[in-house]
C-alpha cells in the first residue's frame, strides 16, 4: 500500500510535469519567442509554489532539532515592492510578539505564551513615583536654600518700611494739611509673606480721597482705546461744581484725573521737599530717591548689605473699584488708571491654602524665585504667576504637600499653553488679559525658555 501511494504521488507529480512541458513546447508556436519566455517564467513560479505547498509540514510551529522553525518564511515578506511601510511596521510588531524562547514550544503542541506579570507595570509606576519624589525633594531643597527669606531679614525690612511710612505721613500732615488723603499703608509680596530670594521690595499705598458726586470711573473696554483692566477717572458735574471744587481738579487733563499728573505732584513732595538724608540719619538708614524714570521710588539701605526699594503708589477708590497709578507700558495710555486685583488675588490664594493646608503659595513662591533668578523669565510678573496657580486650583482639588511636584509641572505646562495662546485671563476678571502688555517677541522668548525646560525641569532650579 505504501508503495502504491508513493507511485501514485510520483505519477501525479510526473503528470503535472508532463503537462507543463507540453504547454511550454507549444507556446513558442502560438505566442512566439517573447511570449513563450514570459509564460515559462510564470509557469515555473506556479510550479515552485506547488512544490513548497506539498513539502510544508502539517504544523507550522513544529521545530527541528536545532530548536528553530523547520520552515523558512516566504521571501516575499522582505520585498520592498510588495510591503509598504505600514505593512512592514505591522508585520514587525506581529513577529516581535511571537515567543522566541524554545521552551515556549512543544514538539507536538503549541503552548500560548505566558502573560506578562503585573509586577512589571508596578515597577514602571514605582519608577515614575521615584522620579516624582526626586523632583519633589529638589523643589523643597530649592525653596529652603534659594527661595525662602529668613524671618529675621523679613522683619527688619518691614520695620524699615514702617519707619519711613511714619515719617512720610507726619511730613504730609504738617506741610500739606489740605491734601485729602486716607492713611497710607504697606502692601506687596513682602507684606503678604510671598516675597522670595531677598526682602528687597515693598509698596506704600497712598489713598486719595475723591468726592463721589464729582468723579466716576469708566472701564477701559468701554472707551475707544479698548483696554480691559484699566479705567478712566472722569470729572463729573462741572456745570454745577466748577473747577476748583475738588482739591484734585489741579490734576485733571482733558476732563479726566491723570495718574501721571498725580504722580508728578507726589514726586515734588517725595524727591524735592523732604530732607531724606536727615531722616535717614535719624533712623540709622541711608535713604535716597531713585533716579528717573522711577520718580516715586525710595532706595533704602537699612543694613550694610541689605537694600529695600519702596514704591509710592497713589490709589483711588470709587464704589467697589480700587485703582492705582501704575501706568500702562505704552505711553499712549498714560491717562489710564490700573485696576488693582492683587489684594483680592492674594486673599483668595491664602483662603484656599488655609482651607486644606495646601501648597499653592509654596508652588507660587518657587515659580517666582525661578523667574527672579532667570533673566530669560524676567518679564513674568507675580500677578501672572499667581493667576496661573489660581486657574490650576480651579481644575485640581488635591493640593496636599506631597503633590507639589505634580502641581509644579502642571503649572509649567499651563503657563506654556497660555503663552502659546498669547492670552492669560485674570482669574477674578476674565476680560483682563494679563499678557496684553507683553510684545509678541517677549511671549515667544518666554514660551521657548519654558518649553525647553519642560523635559528636564530640574534645570530651572540650577539658575
Swiss-Prot record:
GO terms for biological process: mitochondrial fission; positive regulation of mitochondrial fission; positive regulation of mitochondrial fusion; positive regulation of protein targeting to membrane. SMART domains: Mab-21. Changing residue 201 to A: Abolishes ADP binding. This is Mitochondrial dynamics protein MID51. Belongs to the MID49/MID51 family. Homodimer. Interacts with DNM1L. Residues 160-169, 234-243 are annotated as: Important for interaction with DNM1L. Pfam families: Mab-21_C, MID51-like_C. Its main location: mitochondrion. Residues 1-23 are mitochondrial intermembrane. The chain crosses the membrane at residues 24-46. GO terms for cellular component: mitochondrial outer membrane; mitochondrion. It is found in: Mitochondrion outer membrane. ADP binds at residues 187, 189, 201, 340, 342, 368. One of its GO terms (molecular function) is identical protein binding. The gene is Mief1. It comes from the Eukaryota. Residues 57-77 are annotated as: Disordered. The modification Phosphoserine is found at residues 55, 59, 79, 94. It is a single-pass membrane protein. Residues 47-463 are cytoplasmic. Residues 49-195 are annotated as: Dimerization. Keywords: Membrane, Mitochondrion, Mitochondrion outer membrane, Nucleotide-binding, Phosphoprotein, Transmembrane, Transmembrane helix. Mitochondrial outer membrane protein which regulates mitochondrial fission/fusion dynamics. Promotes the recruitment and association of the fission mediator dynamin-related protein 1 (DNM1L) to the mitochondrial surface independently of the mitochondrial fission FIS1 and MFF proteins. Regulates DNM1L GTPase activity and DNM1L oligomerization. Binds ADP and can also bind GDP, although with lower affinity. Does not bind CDP, UDP, ATP, AMP or GTP. Inhibits DNM1L GTPase activity in the absence of bound ADP.
Amino acid at each position: 500500500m505504501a508503495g502504491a501511494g508513493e507511485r501514485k504521488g510520483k505519477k501525479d507529480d510526473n503528470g503535472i510535469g508532463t503537462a507543463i512541458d507540453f504547454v511550454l513546447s507549444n507556446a513558442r508556436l502560438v505566442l512566439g519567442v517573447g511570449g513563450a519566455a514570459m509564460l515559462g517564467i510564470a509557469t515555473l513560479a506556479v510550479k515552485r509554489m506547488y512544490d513548497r505547498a506539498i513539502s510544508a509540514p502539517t504544523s507550522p510551529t513544529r521545530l527541528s532539532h536545532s530548536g528553530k522553525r523547520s520552515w523558512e518564511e516566504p521571501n516575499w515578506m522582505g520585498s520592498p515592492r510588495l510591503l509598504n511601510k505600514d505593512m512592514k511596521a505591522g508585520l514587525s510588531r506581529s513577529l516581535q510578539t511571537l515567543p522566541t524562547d524554545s521552551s515556549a514550544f512543544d514538539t507536538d503542541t503549541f503552548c500560548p505564551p505566558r502573560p506578562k506579570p503585573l509586577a512589571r507595570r508596578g515597577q514602571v509606576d514605582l519608577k515614575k513615583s521615584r522620579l516624582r519624589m526626586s523632583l519633589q525633594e529638589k523643589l523643597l531643597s530649592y525653596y529652603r536654600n534659594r527661595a525662602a527669606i529668613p524671618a529675621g531679614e523679613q522683619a527688619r525690612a518691614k520695620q524699615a518700611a514702617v519707619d519711613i511710612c511714619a515719617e512720610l505721613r507726619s511730613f504730609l500732615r504738617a506741610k500739606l494739611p489740605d491734601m485729602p488723603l486716607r492713611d497710607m499703608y504697606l502692601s506687596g509680596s513682602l507684606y503678604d509673606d510671598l516675597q522670595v530670594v531677598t526682602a528687597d521690595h515693598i509698596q506704600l499705598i497712598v489713598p486719595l480721597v475723591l468726592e463721589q458726586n464729582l468723579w466716576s470711573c469708566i472701564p477701559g473696554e468701554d472707551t475707544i482705546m479698548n483696554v480691559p483692566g484699566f479705567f478712566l477717572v472722569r470729572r463729573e458735574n462741572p456745570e454745577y461744581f466748577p473747577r476748583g471744587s475738588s482739591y484734585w481738579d489741579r490734576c485733571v487733563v482733558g476732563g479726566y484725573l491723570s495718574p501721571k499728573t498725580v504722580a508728578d505732584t507726589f514726586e515734588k513732595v517725595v524727591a524735592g521737599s523732604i530732607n531724606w538724608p536727615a531722616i535717614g540719619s535719624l533712623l540709622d538708614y541711608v535713604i535716597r530717591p531713585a533716579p528717573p524714570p522711577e520718580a516715586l521710588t525710595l532706595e533704602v539701605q537699612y543694613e550694610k548689605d541689605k537694600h529695600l526699594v519702596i514704591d509710592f503708589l497713589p490709589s483711588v477708590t470709587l464704589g467697589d473699584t480700587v485703582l492705582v497709578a501704575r501706568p500702562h507700558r505704552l505711553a499712549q495710555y498714560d491717562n489710564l488708571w490700573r485696576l488693582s486685583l492683587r489684594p483680592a488675588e492674594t486673599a483668595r490664594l491664602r483662603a484656599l491654602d488655609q482651607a486644606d493646608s495646601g501648597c499653592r503659595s509654596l508652588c507660587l513662591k518657587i515659580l517666582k524665585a525661578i523667574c527672579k533668578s532667570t533673566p530669560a523669565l524676567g518679564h513674568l510678573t507675580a500677578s501672572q504667576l499667581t493667576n496661573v496657580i489660581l486657574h490650576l486650583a480651579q481644575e485640581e482639588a488635591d493640593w496636599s504637600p506631597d503633590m507639589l511636584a505634580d502641581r509644579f509641572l502642571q503649572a509649567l505646562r499651563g503657563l506654556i499653553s497660555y503663552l502659546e495662546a498669547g492670552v492669560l485671563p485674570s482669574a477674578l476678571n476674565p476680560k483682563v488679559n494679563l499678557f496684553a502688555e507683553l510684545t509678541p517677541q517677549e511671549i515667544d522668548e518666554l514660551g521657548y525658555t519654558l518649553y525647553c525646560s519642560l523635559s528636564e525641569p530640574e534645570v530651572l532650579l540650577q539658575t
